[in-house]
């Protein structure tokens, strides 16, 4: 874990031991960062410097990279690499069923 880690709200955060965290990460509540349980490979999730992760996010996979200066929007699901200097949000669609 790099210096400058900020956790504004300390509830519901899960970070797997195979995660490398750069400097100045902002990590918000109800977020999970991890890989598959039981995976014993050397793969790691790498989070760059100056990354901002919104609330209620899920970042999973065997080997993922979040680049420097990336922003992950609230309620995002990440199962692929995110390049540096970008903002990522998961587009959500809702279905309303009328009775």
What do these predicted ranges mean?
Residues 92-95:
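Conserved switch/coupling elements of ABC/ABC-like ATPase nucleotide-binding domains
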């Amino acid at each position: 874990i790099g210096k400058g880690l900020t956790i504004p709200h300390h509830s519901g955060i899960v970070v797997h031991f195979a995660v490398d965290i750069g400097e100045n990460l902002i990590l918000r509540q109800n977020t999970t960062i991890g890989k598959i349980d039981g995976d014993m490979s050397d793969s790691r999730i790498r989070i760059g410097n100056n990354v901002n992760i919104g609330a209620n996010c899920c970042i999973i996979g065997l080997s993922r990279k979040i680049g420097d200066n990336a922003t992950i929007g609230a309620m995002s699901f990440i199962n692929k690499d995110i390049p540096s200097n970008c903002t990522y949000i998961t587009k959500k669609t809702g279905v309303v069923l009328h009775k």
